[in-house]
């Protein structure tokens, strides 16, 4: 499988057919299409939220274009981030330990918000033949969040000494250098209060997921349910359980497919780390599509090595690129290389390499345009530049 995350704005900027033609040339099998974003706006017609683009049903366009080209279309929803909903329900924002209530992050423990997302997803499934439902931001975003009076009560009900764990978290993030691992070390040595804190956060995330997924399964038993997960949970349970409330083991039982966001450059990591994340994710039991760093900071070489590392793991299901519009793509055809530039910068130079030779080619490929380059050898690597800056490139 080759997946790609896609912002709805891409259709408005480039045109739906051109965008999906580009995906077809890349060999994309699965498109994860942003259907409800961080702003709270939606890419489809619903009474529950305003549209991203007035007068256009971008989800309908995307489903039609994907199916016409034999691709699967997954409706992608940002879960616990919704600026519009928090503006209407300010008391439901996620509460920071020292800074107070967020104006854009929703508390994932709020049943009212879970029901809202359930209803949004139900609207999509009732009106559109999407192939999947994809949940993102299915988490607390940091251990410093989740400290309202209601949150403290939830931790107490789980059996935690809420005052003690709050003080331990404060010590970890605002104490001295020697305290930087205090709460995580407590988890690892089996501190019952810290374990209860983690359990409460995991349960809140799982309850949110269950509310949405049960409705989706009832409406469409054949639907593919997937989630984008933070990468640390594949190998560091203390970190993921406490920070995010994400348990790969438990979420893997709820979803058909998980997408660990193994964005190597964002974490200062290499391709070996991508393989480590993929290997840990595979153990959770769900199908794994590893999310790769294909946006600013990545290059043709880093993406190639990350993809090889992910695909080299036994049991891995494929890769998913973040995101359409941030990298150049190319397809090898008989005697030529077909290059597409969906980015917002001019491509000025390409480097094409095979086993025995490398060619640097001066090229001018404006945003949204294509170019064909004659080929006389087998290509295995593509790199691209915009003036002095190297940009990401994907070679099919």
Give the location of each predicted region.
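Active-site-adjacent "subsite" loops/lids of carbohydrate-active enzymes
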Residues: 11, 72-128, 145, 185-187, ...
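Catalytic domains of carbohydrate-active enzymes, especially glycoside hydrolases
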Residues: 15-40, 127-132, 251-257, 310, ...
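Aromatic-lined carbohydrate-recognition surfaces of secreted/lumenal glycan-active proteins
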Residues: 5-7, 74-79, 134-141, 168-183, ...
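Substrate-binding cleft of secreted/luminal carbohydrate-active enzymes
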Residues: 254-273, 277-280, 288-331
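Aromatic-lined substrate-binding rim segments of carbohydrate-active enzymes
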Residues: 37-81, 197-219
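Aromatic- and acidic-residue-enriched segments that line the glycan-binding/catalytic groove
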Residues: 45-53, 81-102, 137-186
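Terminal connector regions
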Residues: 377-396
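Glycine-rich, aromatic-flanked loop segments that form ligand/cofactor-binding clefts
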Residues: 30-32, 58-99, 132-139, 222
């Amino acid at each position: 499988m080759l997946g790609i995350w896609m912002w709805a704005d891409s259709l408005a900027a480039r045109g739906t057919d051109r965008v999906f033609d580009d995906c077809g040339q890349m060999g994309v099998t699965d498109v994860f299409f942003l259907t409800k974003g961080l702003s709270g706006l939606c890419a489809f017609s619903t009474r529950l939220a305003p549209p991203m683009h007035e007068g256009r049903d971008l989800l309908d366009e995307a489903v039609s274009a994907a199916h016409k080209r034999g691709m699967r279309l997954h409706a992608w929803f940002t879960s616990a981030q919704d600026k519009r909903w928090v503006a209407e329900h300010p008391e439901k924002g996620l509460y920071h330990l020292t800074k107070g209530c967020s104006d854009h992050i929703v508390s994932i423990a709020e049943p009212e918000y879970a029901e809202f997302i359930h209803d949004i997803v139900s609207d999509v499934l009732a009106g559109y033949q999407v192939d999947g439902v994809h949940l993102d931001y299915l988490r607390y975003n940091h251990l410093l969040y989740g400290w309202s009076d209601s949150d403290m009560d939830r931790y107490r009900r789980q059996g935690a000494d809420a005052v003690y764990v709050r003080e331990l978290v404060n010590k970890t993030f605002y104490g001295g250098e020697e305290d930087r691992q205090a709460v995580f070390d407590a988890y690892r040595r089996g501190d019952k209060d810290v374990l209860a804190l983690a359990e409460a956060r995991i349960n809140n995330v799982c309850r949110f997921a269950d509310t949405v997924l049960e409705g989706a399964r009832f409406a469409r038993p054949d639907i593919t349910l997937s989630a984008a997960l933070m990468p640390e949970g594949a190998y560091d349970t203390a970190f993921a359980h406490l920070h995010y409330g994400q348990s790969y083991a438990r979420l893997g039982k709820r979803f058909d497919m998980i997408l660990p966001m193994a964005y190597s450059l964002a974490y200062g990591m290499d391709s070996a780390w991508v393989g480590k994340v993929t290997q840990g994710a595979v153990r959770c039991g769900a199908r794994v599509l590893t999310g790769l760093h294909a946006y600013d900071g990545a290059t043709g070489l880093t993406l190639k090595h990350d993809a090889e590392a992910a695909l080299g793991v036994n049991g891995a299901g494929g890769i998913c690129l973040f995101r359409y519009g941030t990298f150049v793509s190319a397809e090898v055809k008989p005697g030529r290389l077909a290059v597409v530039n969906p980015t917002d910068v001019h491509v000025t130079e390409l480097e094409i390499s095979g086993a025995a030779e490398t060619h640097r080619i001066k090229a001018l490929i404006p945003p949204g345009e294509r170019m064909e380059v004659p080929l006389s050898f087998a290509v295995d690597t593509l790199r691209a530049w915009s003036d002095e800056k190297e940009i990401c490139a994907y070679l099919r």
